Amino acid sequence: VSTITFDVGSATISKYTTFLESLRNQAKDPSLKCYGIPMLPNTNPNPKYLLVELNAKLSSGEVKSITLMLRRHNLYVMGYSDPYDNKCRYHIFKDISSTTERKDVETTLCPNASSRVSKNISYDSSYPALENKAGRSRSQVQLGIQILNSDIGKISGVKSFTDKTEAEFLLVAIQMVSEATRFKYIENQVKTNFNRAFYPNAKVLNLEETWGKISMAIHGAKNGAFSKPLELQNADGSKWIVLRVDEIKPDVALLKYVSGSCQAT
């Protein structure tokens, strides 16, 4: 399993770009493309998982780190680890329910059996579950490099923290890592607002919820036209009707796996 590292504490726009590009390259199936957009692999790829190490720098100069574990075929975050008390502490989402997968998370995040300790996440990985614990919806949770940096500092190596603190960190990390890897539009929102905190707009939130639908539509398009119009949202929340691949292609970096052939170019 490969680890992609991102130094949040010394991040620049170009370093963030490079980070997302390497994540996309590690995640995608090298042989699958629709209309020039790379696609993620089917459900059982090798390697199956990806690790993303995020390093924060606190105002004291101290470096704190958190490693996220992602399912390669859909970029869902399964859990994370942090160094705690000279051990590797791992945290697994409640909805990772199969014993095999839980074991995988544990051994992939913390390979050394003699120095690992568990601190489970008591809720599911879905946005509604995370928003519930954070006490507000994603539209009210600010994103940004400084926020990600300080959120890591509130959790990494810290003995105890609330579900709220943890869920806020996860909402920020999932959107700035997984969602930005899937969507160029979300990557560009982070870059446009790089040195300030920002609230995700309606288009960001809508893309996050329609990735599967968008992937299916692009995969099924004939000569660049969708079989039926795709109803999405603009940044201001107004209706955005998409009829052709070209109209949404600039916003999409990776397609979710869809079986069967598609037009490659």
Swiss-Prot record:
<comment type="similarity">
    <text>Belongs to the ribosome-inactivating protein family. Type 1 RIP subfamily.</text>
</comment>
<feature type="disulfide bond">
    <location>
        <begin position="88"/>
        <end position="110"/>
    </location>
</feature>
<feature type="disulfide bond">
    <location>
        <begin position="34"/>
        <end position="262"/>
    </location>
</feature>
<dbReference type="GO" id="GO:0090729">
    <property type="term" value="F:toxin activity"/>
</dbReference>
<dbReference type="InterPro" id="IPR016139">
    <property type="entry name" value="Ribosome_inactivat_prot_sub2"/>
</dbReference>
<dbReference type="InterPro" id="IPR017988">
    <property type="entry name" value="Ribosome_inactivat_prot_CS"/>
</dbReference>
<dbReference type="GO" id="GO:0017148">
    <property type="term" value="P:negative regulation of translation"/>
</dbReference>
<keyword id="KW-0611">Plant defense</keyword>
<keyword id="KW-0652">Protein synthesis inhibitor</keyword>
<dbReference type="GO" id="GO:0006952">
    <property type="term" value="P:defense response"/>
</dbReference>
<dbReference type="InterPro" id="IPR016138">
    <property type="entry name" value="Ribosome_inactivat_prot_sub1"/>
</dbReference>
<comment type="function">
    <text>Inhibits protein synthesis in animal cells. Useful as immunotoxin for pharmacological applications.</text>
</comment>
<dbReference type="Pfam" id="PF00161">
    <property type="entry name" value="RIP"/>
</dbReference>
<dbReference type="InterPro" id="IPR036041">
    <property type="entry name" value="Ribosome-inact_prot_sf"/>
</dbReference>
<protein>
    <recommendedName>
        <fullName>Protein synthesis inhibitor PD-S2</fullName>
        <ecNumber>3.2.2.22</ecNumber>
    </recommendedName>
</protein>
<keyword id="KW-0378">Hydrolase</keyword>
<keyword id="KW-0325">Glycoprotein</keyword>
<keyword id="KW-1015">Disulfide bond</keyword>
<dbReference type="InterPro" id="IPR001574">
    <property type="entry name" value="Ribosome_inactivat_prot"/>
</dbReference>
<dbReference type="GO" id="GO:0030598">
    <property type="term" value="F:rRNA N-glycosylase activity"/>
</dbReference>
<feature type="glycosylation site" description="N-linked (GlcNAc...) asparagine">
    <location>
        <position position="120"/>
    </location>
</feature>
<dbReference type="InterPro" id="IPR017989">
    <property type="entry name" value="Ribosome_inactivat_1/2"/>
</dbReference>
<keyword id="KW-0800">Toxin</keyword>
